[in-house]
Amino acid sequence: MVKSHIGSWILVLFVAMWSDVGLCKKRPKPGGGWNTGGSRYPGQGSPGGNRYPPQGGGGWGQPHGGGWGQPHGGGWGQPHGGGWGQPHGGGGWGQGGSHSQWNKPSKPKTNMKHMAGAAAAGAVVGGLGGYMLGSAMSRPLIHFGNDYEDRYYRENMYRYPNQVYYRPVDQYSNQNNFVHDCVNITVKQHTVTTTTKGENFTETDMKIMERVVEQMCVTQYQKESEAYYQRRASAILFSSPPVILLISFLIFLIVG
């Protein structure tokens, strides 16, 4: 019996405390902001007065109406009413006048599409009608069938190109067309560049260079065609309905 009475009193006490807390939350606060008697912002009429008193009637440690440590009505560390670090009132930080930082022109944003386009265009050689320059290769070891040309190649291989010019493989019907075009443009471009430097190629040079460049163009074709077919296979795989359904289901599981 005693235990039941004690439980009832505890329940009544808990309800009373809860009701008192709810009334305290709903009860309106008198006046304005924190530790003030009226409006939170100056200039808004209120029977309780303003949060920031007029000049001449400052709060604790305010000789001239400013905030704490404010000799002339400014913000903290503001000697003359400006923003922080503003000696004579006015605009934004470090500005002595009335011009706001909002009036400054915004910096132009970098367009990501333009950046991506510039990066993609970097692989295309300017002035060569869409030809691309392949990565540097080690010059192949080739035997020409006679000791003179073999020795000549070993002694002069630095004069021959180690990169080739080419178009995308999907623009050609077979390897022979790709290699033929690759050899012609690479030899022509290298010959023109070398001639402008004051060097000339002999008939032996041209014969050896065409053979070397042909081998490099074959290597370039194999590399490019492999990458091309891998891209096509990936596109076909990810465009198939079962894969799309599976990806959609996984996204649903992650998001949901």
Curated annotation (Swiss-Prot):
Where do the annotations place Cu(2+) 3 binding? Answer: H80, G81, G82
**Location of region: Interaction with ADGRG6:** 25-41
Segments carrying the region annotation (Disordered) are: 28-110
Removed propeptide positions: 234-256
Compartments where located: Cell membrane; Golgi apparatus
Subunit relationships: Monomer and homodimer. Has a tendency to aggregate into amyloid fibrils containing a cross-beta spine, formed by a steric zipper of superposed beta-strands. Soluble oligomers may represent an intermediate stage on the path to fibril formation. Copper binding may promote oligomerization. Interacts with GRB2, APP, ERI3/PRNPIP and SYN1. Mislocalized cytosolically exposed PrP interacts with MGRN1; this interaction alters MGRN1 subcellular location and causes lysosomal enlargement. Interacts with APP. Interacts with KIAA1191. Interacts with ADGRG6.
Q: What is this protein called?
A: Major prion protein
Q: Which organism is it from?
A: Felis catus (Cat)
Q: Which gene encodes it?
A: PRNP
